[in-house]
A protein has these predicted regions:
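AMP-binding/adenylate-forming catalytic core of the ANL superfamily
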Residues: 93-99, 110-112, 259, 375, ...
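Conserved AMP-binding/adenylate-forming core of the ANL superfamily
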Residues: 6-7, 23-69, 73-77, 94-99, ...
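Conserved AMP-binding/adenylation subdomain of ANL enzymes
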Residues: 193-210, 218-260, 267-268, 272-279
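Conserved pre-ATP/AMP-binding loop-to-beta segment of ANL
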Residues: 5-7, 22-23, 136-138, 150-174, ...
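Conserved beta-loop-beta connector loops within the AMP-binding
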Residues: 340, 352-372, 408-409, 470-477, ...
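Conserved ATP/PPi-binding loop(s) of AMP-dependent carboxylate-activating enzymes
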Residues: 346-350, 361-391, 429
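Gly/Ser/Thr-rich phosphate-binding loop
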Residues: 231, 256-261, 270-339, 352, ...
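Structural core segment of the AMP-binding/adenylate-forming
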Residues: 54, 84-148
Length: 524
């Protein structure tokens, strides 16, 4: 039986699961390889010994830009065994982001995959890395040595010589930086453990389940998900890229019971299922074993919840988290359809959510304000002390910058971002509220609502949409505003400008809409 209080570090959890489930599968990949929990532990020990021979030890700052593979998980666990400070970097990041992260994190070593998907990561990082930074291409295999040479563990569960103790920073993640420079977010093993335990508890995963990782493992959700696997003892299919048809085929082969990653995955599986049934009308469900589709990272329109749930014939549970706190709330398989489609669930075990009004007082039930939180899964600090000072309220709670309210049933509803507010003639307007209604128009596939500078109003409301049917007559502003009026949207919130694009610009590991790019494009 797993006892959270006895596990203080990621490596302790690896050892716990290896003892409990040594010969049970932990990973299956898209190339037909499988490895057990015990095999991952043993491999990580050999790699840790190899890293140590290269000079990596407790407190060494190691950045890695590696694809989502079994070897990447092994490398990160090996670094955890050594007590290194890890900085994962999304594989799609290029010179601008990577250069900033390497310099800001003061990386001493950088692990890269060599040439991956036609791009030479080794050459890029060698151009960017400062003097004294060692670049280690690991495309042909991780360094290995005899684990007998590793330092013994002290009573606190960290390698001898590790700095500070179990509360030391061991992970530095960088926000996607879609609106500004990336922020360095410092986590400890303990904060990530708390998030992973919250995820495992909310979803009720067990050793009978088979999960999936098709999103970047370098995202903070990667180790969080692996922690949930280690806590509950379930295996997962791991893919180094996500293509819906290929992913669905691999999931069918292995009997995956839980899939997901973000709202974009819901839409991708919905579209793939429709194509699948068109090709094979008698084939049945896209993934017959699937019982849960879960994710977060972006709003989930209720109509997408309904359509994907019907098409895939499974429960859809959406959550809320961020780099600073990867697991805040999560829906559960036991919630009602109304709760799952209209909220982001209840706070997970250990998370304390409060809603603050602009004057700093606590909002009442159903009253909207800024979402603030405390909990064991909350990051330690930003690498920039000024950002840290600005991010916390006087009572020590973290200001998320998100707007929302708590319902009487304890579920959280997100209504927008503090910085995603359009100020029109002095009135604050939530872009998310309008987006949700714009998406209900039958001519609209996707929508983003932005504020544009306006001499008379301060800002005007602009809706940017992609057409559901590109061959159909284009949607007009008059047609859209009539639809929004019929949906009950007040006149002051109606869009004053409509733009139609082939696709919305997206970026970051969760494929979020780049609103700054849209504002720049459509500002007159």
């Amino acid at each position: 039986m797993f006892e959270a209080g006895r596990i203080r570090t990621l490596w302790e959890l690896v050892e716990y699961r290896a003892r409990a489930s040594y010969g049970m599968p932990m990973f299956h990949d898209g190339d037909g390889r499988s490895v057990t929990f015990g095999g991952v532990r043993d491999e990580a020990l050999r790699v840790a010994a190899g890293f140590r021979e290269l000079g990596i030890g407790a407190g060494t700052r190691v950045a890695w830009q590696l694809p989502t593979r079994i070897e990447t998980v092994v490398a990160s666990l090996a670094l955890a065994r050594l007590g290194a400070v890890q900085t994962p970097v999304i594989p799609l990041h290029r010179e601008r982001e990577v250069g900033f992260i390497l310099a800001e994190s003061a990386a001493e070593f950088v692990l890269v995959p060599g040439v991956w998907r036609g791009f030479d990561h080794t050459a890029m990082v060698r151009r960017l890395a400062g003097d004294g930074v060692r670049v280690l291409p690991v495309g042909d295999g991780l360094p290995m040595a005899d684990p007998a040479g590793l330092p013994v563990w002290d009573p606190d569960g960290l390698p001898a010589g590790a700095p500070v103790g179990s509360g030391a920073t061991t992970w530095i993640y960088y926000t996607s930086g879609t609106t500004s420079s990336p922020k360095g977010v410092e986590h400890t093993d303990a904060t990530l453990l708390a998030g992973g335990i919250g995820l495992a508890t909310a979803l009720g995963m067990s050793a009978d389940d088979i999960g999936s990782i098709a999103f970047p493992y370098a995202h903070v959700a990667g180790p969080d998900y692996v922690i949930a696997m280690l806590v509950s003892g379930f295996p997962a299919v791991i893919l180094d890229s996500f293509e819906p048809g290929h992913a669905a085929a691999v999931y069918r082969r292995h009997g995956v019971t839980m899939a997901g990653g973000s709202t974009a995955f819901y839409q991708a599986f919905l579209d793939e299922s429709r194509r699948y049934r068109q090709r094979l009308p008698r084939a049945g469900r896209l993934i017959p074993s699937l019982r849960l589709l879960s994710g977060g990272g972006a709003p989930m329109p209720p109509e997408l919840y309904a359509a994907a749930g019907r098409e895939l014939d499974c429960a859809i549970v959406h959550g809320y988290g961020m780099t600073e706190c990867p697991m805040i709330t999560m829906g559960t398989p036991y919630d009602s359809d109304e709760q799952l489609s209209r909220t982001v669930g209840k706070p997970v075990v250990g998370a304390q959510v409060r809603i603050l009004l602009p004057d700093g007082s606590e909002a009442g039930t159903g009253e909207s304000g800024e979402v603030t939180l405390k909990g064991a899964m909350l990051f330690r600090r930003y690498t920039d002390p000024a950002l840290t000072a600005a991010a916390f309220a006087p009572d020590g709670s973290f200001r998320t910058g998100d707007l929302g309210y708590l319902r009487p049933d304890g579920h959280l509803v997100l209504t927008g971002r503090l910085k995603d507010i359009i100020i029109r003639k002095g009135e604050n307007i939530s872009a998310q509220e309008i987006e949700e209604l714009v998406r209900t128009h039958p001519a609209v596939a996707e929508a983003a609502v932005i504020g544009l500078p306006d001499q008379e109003r301060g800002e005007r409301v602009c809706a940017v949409v992609t057409p559901a049917d590109p061959a159909a007559p284009p949607l007009t502003l008059e047609g859209l505003t009539a639809h929004l009026r019929s949906a009950g949207l007040m006149t002051q919130k109606l869009p004053e400008q409509l733009e139609t694009v082939g696709e919305l610009p997206r970026g970051g590991p969760l494929n979020k809409v780049l609103k700054a790019s849209l504002r720049e494009r459509f500002t007159a």
